[in-house]
Amino acid sequence: MYDMTKLKTRYFDIRLKNGKILNLEPPKLKVLRKIASLSEVKTSGELTENDIKNLTEAVSLSLSKNKQNYKITSENVEENYDIDEMVDFMENYFDWVNSIQNSKN
């Protein structure tokens, strides 16, 4: 019998700007779809207020799914991280999600 409770959870370790270390858990598919949708940033033209709001929410959702149960609000992200940091984080986060999706347990 296949036992889903035996799957080993993989974590994405990250150090926040405040020095706190988090072990991010893989997102559930529903949350992953939402994060992917929210994090789509225009590659040409200017960012709109809505683009920035969506990216900030995507980063907040991604960072808040962690082993430590440490919640990070969109306001916290907006106050402490710039656009380059948010985009860089999302690129690395999706690279990690793709790597665990493509590897065996």
Residue ranges of model-derived segments:
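Short, surface-exposed, charged amphipathic helix/loop patches that serve as local interaction elements
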Residues: 9, 23-105
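Short acidic, Pro/Gly- and aromatic-enriched capping/linker segments at domain boundaries
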Residues: 1-13
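Glycine-centered tight beta-turn/hairpin loop motif at sheet-sheet or coil-to-beta transitions
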Residues: 17-19
